[in-house]
Each structure stands twice: as structure tokens, then as C-alpha cells.
Amino acid sequence: VGSGDGVKITYVFVEAALELVPRELLGSRDVISSARRKGVDPSRMLLDISYHYRSMRRYLADWYKRGRPDIIHTSLLLLSSSPLWSRGLIDAVVETRHGLVFVRSGVRIPRNYNRFVSLMEQVLVEGSAPPGSENPLIYLVKKDLLEYIDEQPLEYIVLLNEKGKKEDPFSLCKKIAMSRRSAILIGGFQRGEFSKRILSRGFERISIYGESLDTWAVVCKINSILESILGIF
């Protein structure tokens, strides 16, 4: 396809397991304990199933889809390590329960997980990183994902889902690369299915494998093919 001039691809992590501790868990013993260890207010701390499993399992009906910040950390690390990222051809949007987190092309994602957690806590609490910046590198917008998608001049939108129509990842990536503006919707959670709100929207649903894959495995596969098609390697 060529050098990718004029191409912009947005990775959208849908229903991401990235959020602050919800109100119903703030008084839970494991939440209070982990907040004390970190020296932070529980309401300003990310929900993490590694530390908050007991209270999540007890109080959250959809606990199995929540509390996995590492999924987004690993996926963003993979994206930000790509020349497509540094050249401004790809960027990322993370759908959270607090709104949409926008990650600009070229932003360096902290390699250290604890630093990433602190960064996301800052963004979700303060609204941006750095806080108060006129041109933040990462920022939160209180907007519905579907409303955001409707506002974008997208030529192609694909929802990657193991229950979708089977398609070779190379042919899928060719369609993405041939579009000047496209969005790749990927589940940002560890288990379960997309909500009816997403599935009923009518997005083209494609499966590149036929079985469930980790979010970062999908990112790695799609991005490596795009790098080849767009002439990076």
C-alpha cells in the first residue's frame, strides 16, 4: 500500500477493565488495606483484581470484566513501541466507566507498571496528564464511545470479536490501510462478551482467529501486519 501518508488508525479499547475503585467497594477491607499500603485515598486508586478480588467477587456482578489495568498497559506499550506510533499513524482511545481516555500519538507510555497505574489514576482523577495542561498528552473526556465514533470522519470501522465473521488478518489489515481514517475496536477486558449496547450497533464484526485471544495478542498481530503493509518494514 505504501508509506501510509494521510492514514490515521485509532485503536479503541472497548469497555476497558480500567477504572477507579467504585463507590460500593470503598469501605471494603482489601480496598482499605491496599490504599494504606500505597498511601492514597481509596477513591483515587485504580481497581485491581490482584488486590481487590474478594470484594469485587462479592459486590460486583460483572467482576470478571473489571480490575485489569495491566491489559491496557501491555497493549499501549506494544502500540507505543511501534514506528507507526512515533510517525503519528496510530493513536488510542480507552473507553472507561469515567469517560474516554485519549492517548496521543508519540506519547511514551511508562514501562514500569506502577508508574503506569499512577499515571492513569492522575488522568481519571485530575482529567489529564500533566494536570491543567492546555495540550495534555493523555486526557479524559466525559463522552459516550458511540457518540464519539459518530462524530469522527471514519471510512472504516471494525469490531474484533471471536464470534464475528472469520477473515484472514492480512486482508483485514489491507482494508484498514486503504482507509484514510479507520477505527479498530478491541475488547479491553479479560473475560465475557461485549455489552448489547456495542453488539447491537451493527459494526462489522470480524474474527481473525476463531477463538478468544488476549487483547495484547490481537494488538501485536494487527499492528505487525500494518507495519508491513504500510511499508515500515
PLM regions: where:
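Structured adenosyl-cofactor binding patch, chiefly the S-adenosyl-L-methionine
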Residues: 190-233
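Eukaryotic short linear interaction motifs
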Residues: 19-21, 101, 166-168, 192-194, ...
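Adenosine-cofactor binding site in Rossmann-like domains, unifying the SAM/SAH pocket
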Residues: 167, 171, 207-210
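Short coil/turn segments at secondary-structure boundaries
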Residues: 24-26, 171-172, 197-199
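Long, charge-patterned amphipathic alpha-helical coiled-coil/hairpin "stalk" segments used as oligomerization
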Residues: 161-170, 180-193
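RNA substrate-binding interface of SAM-dependent RNA methyltransferases
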Residues: 4-163, 227-231
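Short, well-ordered alpha-helix to beta-strand connector turns
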Residues: 154-155, 180, 201-203
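RNase H-like, Mg2+-dependent phosphodiesterase core
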Residues: 174-177, 217
